[in-house]
């Protein structure tokens, strides 16, 4: 329970005042532009609907839980239905992608008229058996900078590596070692709090599943932050097809120069 309350307070889920404090008082990163406020509100609301736990597995069962039990299509409303409690067990990219979809649904519902089309939602919803590098979910689930490449391709946000620019609510791909690709040790998360020498993030974590975790930054070799700034661009999801480079990360390792090029980041 304490884990859940820490997460809620850090992301400002209790009230707008807490939100403003947490998003601007970390001492690291810039204030939230007014145009992005509605996205952060949707993200906080979406995150509040996840229960802690459920177990962590990178298994067929976890993939089926995401694609067949948690993500449904309502033929009557012609809109998606996300049953978050059905998405167990889970793994890091399934947790973050489901949070992205739920937040996008909340954001879209708050607009004067729907922005994300039926065709776009059908492209965004994961399919069981979808391969890495195929379609939006296949991109987001790929090794390396999968989600960063998806967001860059859609023009839905920005990617960067500088801790000083990061703020709560940014997606954060952690690399525990220098390896990127076939033998990488990575973890897709959402930044909750930058505590200086340590960092708190939300994801599906070993062994418990959904929840927040705090680790020393000294354990982290590198990070890629992804910030959603234009959620309306997810309406372009049907244009996301196959990405051979992302698919190849199951078989090869790559360097940061390639990662930055595909993610729209500049080399330092």
Where are these regions (language model features)?
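Bacterial N-terminal signal peptides
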Residues: 7-16
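Short regulatory "switch" loops immediately downstream of catalytic or recognition motifs
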Residues: 101-109, 175-177, 230-233
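Positively charged n-region of N-terminal signal peptides that target proteins for export
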Residues: 1-4
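Boundary at the C-terminal end of the N-terminal hydrophobic targeting segment
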Residues: 18-20
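...with weaker cross-activation on analogous glycine-rich loops/strands in unrelated enzymes
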Residues: 118-209
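Glycine-rich, flexible loop segments associated with nucleotide phosphate handling
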Residues: 84-89, 184-189, 245-247
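N-terminal capping segments
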Residues: 22-142, 263-268
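Low-complexity, Gly/Ser/Thr/Pro-rich intrinsically disordered linker/tail segments
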Residues: 199-268
């Amino acid at each position: 329970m304490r884990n859940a309350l820490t997460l809620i307070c850090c992301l400002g889920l209790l009230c707008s005042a807490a939100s403003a404090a947490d998003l601007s008082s970390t001492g690291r990163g810039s204030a939230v532009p007014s145009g992005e406020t509605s996205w952060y509100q949707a993200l906080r609301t979406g995150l509040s609907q996840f229960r802690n736990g459920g177990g962590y597995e990178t298994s067929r069962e976890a993939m089926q839980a995401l694609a067949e039990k948690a993500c449904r299509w309502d033929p009557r409303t012609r809109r998606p239905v996300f049953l978050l409690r059905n998405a167990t067990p889970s793994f890091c990219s399934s947790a973050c992608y489901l949070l992205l979809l739920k937040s996008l649904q909340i954001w879209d519902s708050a607009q004067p008229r729907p922005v994300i089309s039926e065709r776009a939602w059908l492209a965004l919803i994961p399919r069981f058996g979808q391969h890495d590098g195929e379609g939006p979910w296949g991109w987001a689930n790929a090794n390396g900078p999968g989600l960063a490449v998806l967001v860059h391709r859609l023009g839905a946000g920005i990617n960067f590596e500088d801790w000083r620019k990061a703020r709560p609510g940014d997606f954060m791909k952690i690399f525990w070692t220098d390896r990127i690709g076939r033998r990488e040790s990575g973890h897709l998360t959402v930044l909750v709090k930058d505590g200086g020498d340590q960092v708190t993030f939300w994801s599906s974590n070993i062994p418990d599943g959904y929840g927040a975790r705090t680790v020393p930054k000294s354990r982290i070799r590198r990070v890629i932050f992804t910030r959603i700034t234009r959620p309306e661009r997810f309406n372009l999801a049907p244009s996301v097809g196959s990405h051979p480079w992302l698919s190849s990360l199951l078989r090869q390792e790559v360097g940061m120069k390639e990662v930055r090029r595909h993610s729209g980041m500049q080399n330092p």
